[in-house]
Every structure is written in structure tokens, then in C-alpha cells.
Regions:
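N-terminal pre-Walker A segment at the start of P-loop NTPase domains
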Residues: 205-240, 275, 283-288, 292-299, ...
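Conserved NTP phosphate-binding and transfer environment spanning the P-loop NTPase/kinase superfamily
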Residues: 387-390, 396-576
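Glycine-rich phosphate-binding P-loop
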Residues: 239-271
């Protein structure tokens, strides 16, 4: 349909009851672009209507370099989304009415760059998805105000923010070139046997606990000469910084000297960051996971026997389950689940770990004999994890000297300055013999959790004639995102507070629909968590996020999480 036909429809339904807005669903040609009205809200106080704009890239005029590869495309879409957000924010609520009338809303990205459903290029077309609150007076349609949005506000937003001729070409080029340089660093990590890289001049401290913006007047990162490496990038040329080698790296130093700040930067180095963030060239192995203790965590059928055996209650640690894990059992499960999710790097902060899981000093071994202690500490397994499973560790510590014995590289943070003290510490260790190791022989976990469909996870209905409660196979589970780190599926809350590398609510929204899809289509009592994650990734690569929408049109608000976060979500689901 043409835009003029849309204008006629608006005129026809003006002053009618709000449900008459449903007649607007469809696609309308605005010459340069197509406006798609995909879902219309039920009333002005409900969640806003779902719209999209599709624009041929030839019309938009984007240069070839901006679409030359996946990294460039992702950066282009991120840039356009930020540009469109800046424009629509100016017009939001300029159209008046009740409730959400006049709202124009699109995702507001943070400092990380993601592939998002909000803005993507598919088959030579840019698609940008957003939400609009259709105006009403009470529950009576005010289509004159909606006409302003469709025929005045949105055309200006498209013109100013999506057409290349009106964009800042230099800023866009900076966005694209940085993304390609970041991809080049990730490629070079493996070739140099590095698990992370922090460029000289990076700004690691953040503004505050509630702001991820770079701290003003912060000490810029400088690499120790002994750990400095140089990388050649396609656009930035030669840059230098600290290369963190594979193996076991220990970060030590006094309190408030920057140990955790460095680790926090590394844990988010799995993502690309925008220009000006300060961590643009902080790049970490993209399978890295942060491990920490999670008291009270649900665990099911995890083989934690690598760390815990011979429990007094006779529980089988080769297939360990609990509704209320201790700090040590939760962290042990996290290690095993991370291995199964394909992680090649563990990031651990002593402050957020279970002490009895991490270390057991020599004097404690003398007081409590090994046959009375079911826990084999991480210090006894870290070397074996690297040599037998290829998993490196970066560990922050400040209280125990036991960690020095297992480290390949030891970095001291001194007032945010980095010092390589490996040789100095190795000399001192001659005076402190390695504590006796009573650990059982290393063996990779054998059993893996098979997810089974729990009847409680299936929607129920009550038969109005008999009063009996039955499974309703025609209904689907309801999901609701609560916060950035939790969502509801059915009546269960999935708690992701300790999955600390989640940074965006769109990741959480995606985890919710992925879990819903898995419960309804993949969990069958035969597949392991890893198999289900692989299948979800395969479907996404083939069909995109729309494959998980149950036939509904894809909206903005989704970004595909990593394999590691999908696995973490499945492992925290209590009903499978």
C-alpha cells in the first residue's frame, strides 16, 4: 500500500475506539523506505506498537567499505542505531495523548557493540525496528497525532540518521576501522599464544559503580617492558601493549591499586567497545568466563569430582545435584560447566571466590588430614586444567601466597601501574617449598547433564466442566524480563546475577526466548546442555533470531548471547 492510502486509513479511523488501530497493520511505501506496522497495541496504556523501516542500502548510499565484512557490517548497524536513537529521542512524546501516546523508542546501546535485532542489514536492505505509542485521548483514537509521527517525524529521522549523505563520514569510518582492528587483534591472539591483550594508553577505571564511562584523569595503562608485544593492525598500524600469555597469570597488589579493575576490563574484553570507551584495544579470548561462588545456586547432574569427593552425606559428586549449593560446590560446578561450554580461559577474583575452594595452605593440611577434607582446591588443579584441557587462568589474589607456586606470570598492580614481578617472586619461592599435593589423579569430567522436560514446566489449564488441571499443549510458556540479570519463564525466576559478563538487557531478553524455545522444542531427555546450545546456535546462524519468535514478527530488543551465557542460563533452569 502507498503512504497516501495509510493517510486515508488514519482519517477513516479518527475518533473511533482504540482497537480500530488494528486496521493499520501492513506495509506502506514512503518512496525511499517501507514502513511496516507489525503489531498494534491493545490500548494506549499497553506496551507500544511494534514497527520497522526497511530501506535499500543503494538508496541509503552506504560505501562499500562499510559492508566489506561481518565486523564492518556490525559496526555500521551499531552506528546507524545510535544515530537513529538520537533523532527519534528528540521527537518522542511530541505527539500528545494518554498513556504511552507519542512514544517513539528504539534501543539505546551501551559501550559494547553487538549484533542486534534492532538494526540489521538483510538481503541488501537496512531494517530498523522500533516502538511507537499510538496516540489516543482516553481510549479514543487521535490519528491526527499519529499522522504527525508517520508523515513528519519519522521521515525527518530517516533522512538525518540513516542516509549516508547526512551522516558524519569521518565518525562512521572511525567506527568501521576500529571494528576491523579489533577483529585483527582477536585473530592475532591465537597466533601469539596469548589469551588477552591490553593496549598501552588504555583507560581501564570506570567513572563510578553505576557508570561504565571512562574515569576522567585516570592513569593510562602502561605495559611492563618484559610483557610488551607489538601488533600490526590494518588501520591503526603498529600498537603496543601487554600480552597475557596462555597458562596461569596471577595479578597481585595492595588493596585499591587496580587489581580488580584490570580483571573487570579483561572480563568485558570478550566484546568490542566503541571509540572513546578507553578499552577499545582491551581484547580477551572470546570464550573467557568469570568464575565466582554462588551460594544458594541450583545445580543438577554436574560431575564435580575433579574438586569434591567423599562428602559426609555420601552424595555422589560424579553427578552432583542440589537446590542450595554452597560457595565451594557452586564454584566447582561453574568450572565444569565452563569446560563443557568450551571456555579456554577462566577469570577469577579471590574476593568473590569460596576460600576453601581456591586454596588449602600447608598448616591447614597438617591440622586437617587429606582423608578428612573432601575438597581438592583450585590451586591443585589449575596447572592440570591448562596442560590437560588447554584452559588458562587469570587470577586476582591479595591474601594467600599459595597462588604464587602455580603461576607462570605474576603481575603486580601498584597504584594502577603494572609491574612484572615474576622473576623476583620465583627467586623468593626457593625459600618456600611447594606444599604437599594430596590431590587425586586428574580426570576430565565424564558425565554431562541431560536436560529432561519437567511436567511442571508445561503450561496448565483447568477443565471448566470437571475442574481438573491438565497440560495444555496448545499454550506456550510465558516469559517476562524482570531486570538485566533475571527473567521469568512460566512461574519460575531464572537468576543470572552471577553471570557477570551479561551487560545488556537485550542479552537477557534473548536468553529468555532461547530457553523458552529449548523447553518447548529441544529438551527431550536425550540431549545434553552442550547439544542444546549447539542446536540453538545452529538455528540462529541459519535463520536468525526470528526463528525463536513462534511465528510472531521479530521486534527490536534482542541480541544473541555467547555460547557460554546460553549454557549458564540452561544450567540455572530448575525445571529440566
Amino acid at each position: 500500500m502507498t503512504s497516501q492510502e495509510l493517510k486515508k486509513l488514519l482519517n477513516d479511523i479518527d475518533h473511533k475506539s482504540y482497537p480500530a488501530y488494528k486496521a493499520l497493520r501492513g506495509s506502506y511505501d514512503f518512496d525511499r523506505y517501507i514502513l511496516n506496522i507489525e503489531h498494534v497495541q491493545g490500548d494506549p496504556f499497553a506496551a507500544p506498537s511494534q514497527l520497522s523501516i526497511s530501506l535499500p542500502v543503494t538508496t541509503a548510499g552506504y560505501p562499500d567499505f562499510s559492508m566489506a565484512n561481518t565486523s564492518a557490517l556490525t559496526a555500521l548497524c551499531d552506528f546507524l542505531l545510535r544515530s537513529f536513537n538520537a533523532e527519534v529521542t528528540r521527537y518522542s512524546f511530541q505527539a500528545k495523548g494518554s498513556g504511552k501516546s507519542g512514544l517513539i523508542q528504539v534501543a539505546q546501546p551501551g559501550l559494547e557493540i553487538f549484533e542486534r535485532s534492532d538494526c540489521e542489514i538483510v538481503k541488501e536492505k537496512l531494517i530498523i525496528r522500533f516502538f511507537v505509542g499510538f496516540p489516543a485521548n482516553g481510549r479514543t483514537i487521535n490519528s491526527r497525532e499519529l499522522e504527525k509521527i508517520f508523515f513528519e517525524f519519522l521521515p525527518k529521522c530517516v533522512e538525518k540518521s540513516l542516509l549516508y549523505r547526512n551522516l558524519c563520514a569521518d565518525t562512521l569510518k572511525k567506527w568501521i576501522y576500529l571494528a576491523e582492528d579489533q577483529a585483527a587483534i582477536r585473530t592475532q591472539l591465537a597466533a601469539l599464544s596469548l589469551c588477552a591483550f591490553i593496549a598501552d594508553g588504555s583507560i581501564l577505571p570506570r567513572e563510578s559503580g553505576i557508570s561504565q564511562k571512562p574515569m576522567k584523569s585516570a592513569v593510562a595503562f602502561t605495559s611492563p617492558a618484559s610483557l610488551r608485544v607489538s601488533l600490526d593492525l590494518p588501520h591503526a598500524g603498529k600498537i603496543s601493549g601487554m600480552g597475557v600469555s596462555k597458562g596461569i597469570t596471577l595479578i597481585v597488589g595492595g588493596g585499591y591499586h587496580g587489581k580488580s579493575t584490570l580483571l573487570n576490563s579483561l572480563e568485558l574484553g570478550i566484546y568490542n567497545h566503541i571509540p572513546g570507551d578507553g578499552r577499545e584495544y582491551v581484547i580477551t579470548d572470546d570464550t573467557a568466563i568469570k568464575l565466582l561462588a554462588e551460594d544458594g545456586r541450583f545445580i543438577k547432574d554436574v560431575d564435580i569430582s575433579l574438586f569434591i569427593n567423599d562428602l559426609p552425606n555420601k552424595k555422589d559428586t560424579h553427578s552432583f545435584s542440589t537446590e542450595d549449593a554452597s560457595g565451594s560446590t557452586s564454584q566447582a560446578a561453574g568450572v565444569i560447566e565452563g569446560m563443557e561450554a568450551g571456555s579456554r580461559l577462566f577469570l577469577i577474583d579471590e574476593d568473590t571466590s569460596a576460600t576453601n575452594f581456591m586454596v588449602r595452605d600447608a598448616f591447614m593440611q597438617r591440622v586437617i588430614s587429606s582423608d578428612k577434607e573432601p575438597i581438592t582446591p583450585f590451586t591443585a588443579r589449575a596447572r592440570e586444567l591448562y596442560e590437560n584441557a588447554g584452559i588458562s587462568t587469570i587470577l586476582v589474589a591479595g591474601s594467600s601466597g599459595a597462588f604464587f607456586h602455580i603461576a607462570d606470570t605474576i603481575i603486580q598492580m601498584d597504584n594502577y601501574h603494572t609491574v612484572d614481578i615474576t622473576s623476583h617472586v620465583k627467586d623468593l619461592l626457593c625459600e618456600y617449598p611447594v606444599p604437599a599435593d594430596s590431590a587425586k589423579p586428574f580426570a576430565l569430567p565424564a558425565s554431562k547433564r541431560i536436560m529432561t522436560k519437567d511436567p511442571q514446566g508445561t503450561p496448565k489449564r483447568r477443565d471448566y466442566r470437571t475442574g481438573a488441571v491438565k497440560n495444555n499443549d496448545n499454550d506456550s510458556l510465558k516469559v517476562k524480563v524482570l531486570t538485566r540479570d533475571s527473567f521469568m519463564i512460566g512461574k519460575q525466576t531464572v537468576d543470572l546475577r552471577y553471570v557477570e559478563q551479561l551487560t545488556d538487557s537485550e542479552q537477557t531478553a534473548s536468553l529468555a526466548i532461547l530457553l523458552k524455545y529449548a523447553v518447548e522444542h529441544l529438551i527431550d531427555g536425550k540431549k545434553t546442555v552442550a547439544m542444546i546450545v549447539d542446536e540453538l546456535n545452529r538455528i540462529y546462524k541459519r535463520d536468525g533470531m526470528s526463528a525463536f519468535m513462534d511465528g510472531r514478527p521479530l521486534s527490536g530488543g534482542y541480541t544473541m548471547p555467547r555460547t557460554q551465557e546460553i549454557a549458564a542460563c540452561l544450567n540455572r533452569y530448575r525445571r529440566a
